[in-house]
Amino acid sequence: MSAPRTLYDKIWDDHLVDEQADGTCLLYIDRHLVHEVTSPQAFEGLRMSGRKVRAPEKTLAVVDHNVPTSPDRHLGIKNEESRIQVEQLAKNAAEFNVEYYSENDKRQGIVHIIGPEQGFTLPGMTIVCGDSHTSTHGAFGSLAHGIGTSEVEHVLATQTLIQKKAKNMLVQVDGQLPAGVTAKDIVLAIIGEIGTAGGTGYVIEYAGEAIRSLSMEGRMTICNMSIEGGARAGLIAPDEITFEYIKGKPRAPKGEALEQAIAYWKTLKSDEGAHFDRIVKLNAAELPPIVSWGSSPEDVVSVQGIVPNPDEIQDETKRASKWRALDYMGLKPGTKMTDIAVDRVFIGSCTNGRIEDLRAAAKVVEGKTVASTVNAMIVPGSGLVKEQAEAEGLDKIFKAAGFDWREPGCSMCLAMNDDRLKPGERCASTSNRNFEGRQGFKGRTHLVSPTMAAAAAIAGHFVDIREWN
């Protein structure tokens, strides 16, 4: 009888082509997502060596990082560098026979949102993309992670990837989530607990009552930020919630093929007694709404908390780092989080740009008005999310409250397009990174859930969504 295996072990074993004596492995890749930023050199490498894309049907390309989200984007991209990257992806996709969603295709959107929407992402698969937040797709019980540009070329040419196996970590989140606490708060709490290096060398499996209770959108939020916890990937075993989400998606199996697939997908779970190299446990019932205060995703506190004092940190290097973060953020120790005013609010990104996120934000802002001191924007994660939101009238709620309603794209998650912070501006953001300059030169980012961001837009400062009226 074989030894008990984790979910990660099972997917790894199913895709192992070859293993060298030193542990270097060759993995087969089932799905390859491509965007305009990390692919130009890879396609050029194929061109120079006279190679073709080995499996175009397992490859999907979309523009997301550089595209404007303004209503007039159909008139063209003004920034020359961005325009060239977008045009080059269109050219490369056509030349190498790869399916491509342009900025004018309603299926276009952030790469990690369109994959699941199309049924391109399925349980048990190996999925890669030249983007660190590829871990998002692990919510389906797939092994998904980012790769570098040279690896993008390797996968395009061979449909394989050279890897060494990571260790197994289990993050068990038991208990029921209190009202006002979301998947975003869970993952920020996890990163606050283990630190941004806590997952280094690991693949994380998320489990427990609180995780099982989440929708697919919530699970994608959790897995999305695995990389912020230092992990190679994050995954959640598929279940009936997963299967229901997949049914009817354009590229998903149908009929008897779907039944056969589900029978296999039901085996994708860690065996009883499987070995994990590290186990972390959290009680969801004790989690508050969370806000980041510094320039690292591990810099988090309860919304009812205060900005911490770095002098209480014993490690000299870490203490200096946290003082630098406070200086950059323009904050002082002891400041109440609810006393921090915001200039901008961004609701969107591959972390929180799905229909469930927009519905939650709309409930908070309906009948209210954005504070006069705040500029707030809603950026749907894809054209299909935007279409669904408009069918439900969410756009009207946001516009009536004073939010900008934008076209889909990565937008203000990163300063690679027209949506960015000005120096010194403070933003409540539903994205995944609060690094220095991430949203714009000298911009200050606070990571929060969609409901917390929406409430901050109305109040003009952070508020406890549990007490929001």
UniProtKB/Swiss-Prot annotation:
Catalytic activity: (2R,3S)-3-isopropylmalate = (2S)-2-isopropylmalate
One Gene Ontology term from the biological process aspect of the record: L-leucine biosynthetic process
Keywords: 4Fe-4S, Amino-acid biosynthesis, Branched-chain amino acid biosynthesis, Iron, Iron-sulfur, Leucine biosynthesis, Lyase, Metal-binding
Cofactor note: Binds 1 [4Fe-4S] cluster per subunit.
UniProt pathway annotation: Amino-acid biosynthesis; L-leucine biosynthesis; L-leucine from 3-methyl-2-oxobutanoate: step 2/4
Pfam families in alphabetical order: Aconitase
PROSITE patterns linked to this entry: ACONITASE_1, ACONITASE_2
Binding site for [4Fe-4S] cluster: C350, C410, C413
Cofactor: [4Fe-4S] cluster
Enzyme class: lyase
Primary role: Catalyzes the isomerization between 2-isopropylmalate and 3-isopropylmalate, via the formation of 2-isopropylmaleate.
Family to which this protein belongs: Belongs to the aconitase/IPM isomerase family. LeuC type 1 subfamily.
NCBIfam families: leuC, PRK05478.1, PRK12466.1
Record's subunit section: Heterodimer of LeuC and LeuD.
Record protein name field: 3-isopropylmalate dehydratase large subunit
The organism of origin for this protein: Rhizobium etli (strain ATCC 51251 / DSM 11541 / JCM 21823 / NBRC 15573 / CFN 42)
Gene (UniProt): leuC
